[in-house]
Amino acid sequence: MSEPLLQLTGISRSFTAGDREFLALKNIDLTIHAGEMVAIIGASGSGKSTLMNILGCLDYATAGSYRINGRETRDLDNQALAELRRDYFGFIFQRYHLLPHLSAVHNVEMPAIYAGTPEPQRHARARELLARLGLEGHLTHRPSQLSGGQQQRVSIARALMNGGEVILADEPTGALDTTSGKEVMRILLELHAAGHTVILVTHDPKVAANAERIIEVSDGEILSDRRNERDTAALSNEDAVPKSTAARRLVASLGLFKEAFNMAWVALISHRMRTLLTMLGIVIGITSVVSISAIGEGAKRYVLKDIQAIGSNTIDIYSGTSFGDSRSAAIETLVPADVTALNQLYYVDSATPVVGRNLLLRYRNIDLDAQVNGVSDLYFQVRGIKMESGIPFSESDARRQAQVVVIDHNTRHRLFGEGVDPLGQVILIGNLPCTVIGVAAENKNIFSSSKSLNVWVPYETAAGRLLGQRYLDSISVRIKDGQPSKVVEDNVNKLMLQRHGTKDFFTNNLDSVMQTVQKTSRSLALLLSLIAVISLVVGGIGVMNIMLVSVTERTREIGIRMAVGARQSDIRQQFLVEAVMVCLLGGAIGISLSYAIGHLFSLFIKEWEMVFSLTSVLTAVICSTLIGIVFGFVPARNASRLDPIEALARD
C-alpha cells in the first residue's frame, strides 16, 4: 500500500487553564490516504475540532508525530506550517469565514495571492471555480448579498483555489437549511470523486454517512474507525495546481505587497472619520515641519539679502579698540595713505575713505539736518549702492574737490517733493553750495532707517572745504569675489598693524554677521523643528493606538488569512503597510496644507515669503514613512502573533 498522505502517531494535545491541565487529545494514531473521504464524528467537546486543527496545521500537538506526505511537522516553524496550509489544505468552515468587504471573486482569490499566482491567472481561476459551483451571476457580490448556501459555495471555491489536495470541512452543513445542505454535500462528493481527499468534521451521523470511512472520537480518543461501503470512483485531481517555486514566491511577494496596499486602502475608506482623526496628528506635525522650514528659510534669505545689500563681502576699519571706545575720538591715525595701501592688495576689490558729520542742508526755504559723508568714487561700488537717477561723482571730481553731491531717496523727497527734478539743483551743505548730480535708489532693509537722510560728497571736498579734517572716521574695504573673508580680514589687520605700529584700530566684518545670522537661523529652525517633531510623535502614538484597535477589530480576518496560507510575515507586512499609508496620506495632506499656508502668507506679507525646498518635502515624506514603520510595528507584530484558532473563534 502507498505511503499515507496524512499520518498521526501518538498525538496528544493538552491545554492549561489556570493551574489545571487537561488533555483534548490522547495518544491518537491515524492514517489517511490520498483520495479518501473521511468523516470525523463526535459530540461537542469530544476533541474532533482539535484533531481537525492539528490535521490542517492550524494547531500543534503537545506530543507525538504528524507527517504530511512523509514530511514531519513537529519541528516546523510558523512560516513552514503556513506553506503547508497553503499548498495542501483547503478549509470549509461552518460559519463560512468570508471577508465581508470583499466580493465573491476576491474572497476566492485570497489563497492564490499567498501562493504567488499572477493576478490574471488567479482571477480567471476564481471565476471558473465560482461558475462550476453555480455562482457565475454572483461574482461581484459581497457576502452580505449572498444566501447561506451561496456563501458556503464561495467557501468551497476558496478551498479549491490552490488545488485543495485535502479539503477540511468543519460542519459544512451546520448553518444551512436542508436543501442547501444537500447541495453542499453533493459538491463535496463530486470533489472526492475528482480525487480530492475530503475530511468531514461533524456531529451529525447523516452527514458522516456520506463518507467512505467514519472515525468516531470521544473524550480525546478514537473509539472506532470503520469503513462505510459506498460506490465511489476515485479520479485524478483535476484541480491540482503547481506547488510553490522560488520564482512563484517572488511573484507572491510582489502580489502580497500590492494586496497589502489594496487592503489598507479598503480599511481606511471603510472608517473615514477614524482615519481622519488618526491622521490629524501626522497632518499637524508635517504641516509644522514643512511650514517652519519654509518660514525659517524665507526669513534667512530676507536677512541675508539685506546684509548683501549693504555689502556682505566688506570689511570696515574704525579707530579705537571696539565700538563704544571712549578714546576713539582722540585717535586720528586712519589716513588716506592707508586707503591707498589697501587698494594695492590683490584680494581687495576696492577701498574707500569715509568721514561723516551731521550738517544743515538748505534748498530755498527748506532746512534739514542730514548725515554728510565724505567718500571716494569707489564707495558706491563698495556698498553696492545703485542710482535712481543721475550718476555718482568720479575720480576727477574728487581730485579737483568738485562741489557735487549725491543725495538719497529720503533727502530728495524732503527737499524737493514731487514734481521737481533734483538733478542740477544747487543745495547748501553747511555754507558750501553743491550741485546735485545723482539720487541713490531707495534701499529698504532691516539695517537702515526708512527716515534717515544721507548725502555723499567727494572725500577731498569734505576734508578740504566742509570739515577741515584730514584723518578718516573709517575705511570700507570690498573683498574680491571668491576670496575667503576671514583670511582677507587677517591680512588687512596685519597690513594696518605694520603701518601703524600699534593696534589702534579694529575691524568689523559683515561676513561674520552673515554667518551669525545663518547659525542663529539654523538653531531657531532646529528648536522649532523639535517642537514639530513632538507633535509628530504624538501623532505616531495616535496611529499606533488606532492600529491596535484595528487589529482587535479584524482578528477574525487575520485568522482567515492565516488559515488560507498567510505567513506571519504576510500579516505583519499588511498592517505595516496600512500604518505607513495612513502616515503618508497624513504627510501628503500636511505638505499640501503647508503650501496653502505659504500662499496665504504671500497675500498678507509682501516683504518676504515662505521658501519651500525639495529637501523639506522629502524630509516630510521620510518622516511620515518612518513614523508609520516605527509606530505601526507593534500593532503589526501583535497581529502576526495571533493564534489562528483563537482568531477564527472571534466574532
Swiss-Prot record:
<protein>
    <recommendedName>
        <fullName>Probable export ATP-binding/permease protein Pfl01_2215</fullName>
        <ecNumber>7.6.2.-</ecNumber>
    </recommendedName>
</protein>
<feature type="domain" description="ABC transporter">
    <location>
        <begin position="6"/>
        <end position="244"/>
    </location>
</feature>
<dbReference type="InterPro" id="IPR003838">
    <property type="entry name" value="ABC3_permease_C"/>
</dbReference>
<dbReference type="InterPro" id="IPR050250">
    <property type="entry name" value="Macrolide_Exporter_MacB"/>
</dbReference>
<feature type="transmembrane region" description="Helical">
    <location>
        <begin position="250"/>
        <end position="270"/>
    </location>
</feature>
<dbReference type="Pfam" id="PF00005">
    <property type="entry name" value="ABC_tran"/>
</dbReference>
<comment type="function">
    <text>Probably part of a tripartite efflux system.</text>
</comment>
<dbReference type="GO" id="GO:0005886">
    <property type="term" value="C:plasma membrane"/>
</dbReference>
<keyword id="KW-0547">Nucleotide-binding</keyword>
<feature type="binding site">
    <location>
        <begin position="42"/>
        <end position="49"/>
    </location>
    <ligand>
        <name>ATP</name>
    </ligand>
</feature>
<dbReference type="Pfam" id="PF02687">
    <property type="entry name" value="FtsX"/>
</dbReference>
<keyword id="KW-1278">Translocase</keyword>
<dbReference type="Pfam" id="PF12704">
    <property type="entry name" value="MacB_PCD"/>
</dbReference>
<feature type="transmembrane region" description="Helical">
    <location>
        <begin position="524"/>
        <end position="544"/>
    </location>
</feature>
<dbReference type="InterPro" id="IPR025857">
    <property type="entry name" value="MacB_PCD"/>
</dbReference>
<keyword id="KW-0472">Membrane</keyword>
<keyword id="KW-1133">Transmembrane helix</keyword>
<dbReference type="InterPro" id="IPR003593">
    <property type="entry name" value="AAA+_ATPase"/>
</dbReference>
<feature type="transmembrane region" description="Helical">
    <location>
        <begin position="614"/>
        <end position="634"/>
    </location>
</feature>
<keyword id="KW-1003">Cell membrane</keyword>
<dbReference type="InterPro" id="IPR003439">
    <property type="entry name" value="ABC_transporter-like_ATP-bd"/>
</dbReference>
<comment type="similarity">
    <text>Belongs to the ABC transporter superfamily. Macrolide exporter (TC 3.A.1.122) family.</text>
</comment>
<dbReference type="GO" id="GO:0016887">
    <property type="term" value="F:ATP hydrolysis activity"/>
</dbReference>
<feature type="transmembrane region" description="Helical">
    <location>
        <begin position="585"/>
        <end position="605"/>
    </location>
</feature>
<keyword id="KW-0812">Transmembrane</keyword>
<dbReference type="InterPro" id="IPR027417">
    <property type="entry name" value="P-loop_NTPase"/>
</dbReference>
<dbReference type="GO" id="GO:0022857">
    <property type="term" value="F:transmembrane transporter activity"/>
</dbReference>
<keyword id="KW-0067">ATP-binding</keyword>
<keyword id="KW-0997">Cell inner membrane</keyword>
<dbReference type="InterPro" id="IPR017911">
    <property type="entry name" value="MacB-like_ATP-bd"/>
</dbReference>
<comment type="subunit">
    <text>Probably part of a tripartite efflux system, which is composed of an inner membrane transporter, a periplasmic membrane fusion protein, and an outer membrane component.</text>
</comment>
<keyword id="KW-0813">Transport</keyword>
<feature type="transmembrane region" description="Helical">
    <location>
        <begin position="276"/>
        <end position="296"/>
    </location>
</feature>
<dbReference type="InterPro" id="IPR017871">
    <property type="entry name" value="ABC_transporter-like_CS"/>
</dbReference>
<dbReference type="GO" id="GO:0005524">
    <property type="term" value="F:ATP binding"/>
</dbReference>
